[in-house]
Amino acid sequence: MAAHTFYVNFVDDSFSKDDWDKFLGRSVNEQVTAGVAVHPLRDVLDDLESMDGLVKQGIDVVVGGPPCQGFSLAGRRNPADVRNKLPWEYLEFVQRTRPKIVVIENVVGMSHRFSPDEESPFVQLQQALRDTGDGYIVQGVAVNALHYGAPQNRPRLMILGLRVDVAEANGFVATENLWRSAFLDEIDGEVPALAPRPTVTRAQSPTVADAIGDLQTVFPAHDGPRATAFRRQLQTRAAWGLPRPSSNSGDIPNQTLRKHSVLTQERFRLYQWLRTSDISPRVLNRALTDEQAHDDLARDLAGSGFPAVSPDGTKIADDAAELVKLIDRLHTRKHSQKALAWDEPAKTVVTLPDDYVHPSEPRILTVREMARFQGFPDDFVFVGKETTGSLRRRFEVPQYSQVGNAVSPFLASAVGTMIRHLLGDVAADAS
């Protein structure tokens, strides 16, 4: 599904489902030649014709996000788990194609040590890249998409490598310490050559309202200067250097509202009221097993404004006692669900849509709203199922997962700008 989305947006958007099914049946080399290899990376590495073509073509940059939490120089923690092989296959691809620049992106958990006898996978993978092929100088960075213009708090780790001969010929060096991003007006010291420079100040950082305020119907559309500037960036994918759509219906794609039961909508409205009242949503996790527990909670809520009314005007409760009864009826063991705030950036976009409730409408977020938080243009189309069951997610990548697994285009653009400057300097020195 994710490969189909890539093909539709980067190669040919007239490709039908039948065309895609036929494409999946093509050989490895045919897919590589077409620009999208859907086969496993191991198949590409084992296909000599494909690899010879890539080597002869010459590759400047290799970018990827192999699952690295289980990476170890001493061996694989679980040899039966194919995901533990992917970092090594990625490094093999780098070794054989000799790109000038390598970029690896992953979650912050990659920095955790799993054994007192080993460094973290993040540290070990940096060393492995240094030793790959002709060698690379390596810069580790901790970045947050928020510092690059995304309306979302999204911390990530990245490893950026520049081939040693290219680095030495042009005087580029990496710092020994991990570099951490910050807002443009809060950067402490110089930004390393192998680090993406932040692009927004704290005041310029967009909020949930800036990102999706025009996609809701409860309040007037939020159209301040910051919102206007943000949405202008996302109007078309052509503004990002991507191919223009062959057709445009005028409708924003992937903006299908999810349907919920009456009980679920009640819970969502309660989450919204709790947020606006500055009350933790964890009150829904409290076990109200006796009258004393009810009285204690009612006393805690007594200072809140009543009647309790949700953002869409629905009355939730007339007083604290009625609200406690509602909380008892809507009790849940789910700890991660909460309503987003209009005046803050979004939480980290994840692959499952159920954790975050819309700020003013009793529903979860749409695929498009999540894509806005990431920074995808409005005419960037996600194809396939919207969501799927947990077991099928092992081999299917539905739309919500495609969005949640992606690198924010805002951060990706900053990395691309850094690479363009590096390679531009290399080309200038070579001429």
Report the location of each language-model feature.
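Glycine-rich phosphate-binding loop and adjoining beta1-alpha1-beta2 segment
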Residues: 1-54
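Conserved beta-strand scaffold positions in the cores of enzyme catalytic domains, especially
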Residues: 35-38, 138-140, 348
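Class I S-adenosyl-L-methionine
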Residues: 47-56, 74-321
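Residue-level detector of short, conserved catalytic/binding motifs and their immediate flanks
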Residues: 60, 157, 347
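N-terminal Rossmann-like NAD(P) cofactor-binding module of classical short-chain dehydrogenase/reductase
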Residues: 60-63, 103
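Glycine-rich, N-terminal phosphate-binding loop of Rossmann-like dinucleotide-binding domains
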Residues: 66
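Active-site beta-alpha loop architecture of Rossmann-like, nucleotide-cofactor-dependent enzymes
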Residues: 69
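C-terminal target-recognition/interaction regions appended to catalytic cores
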Residues: 230-431
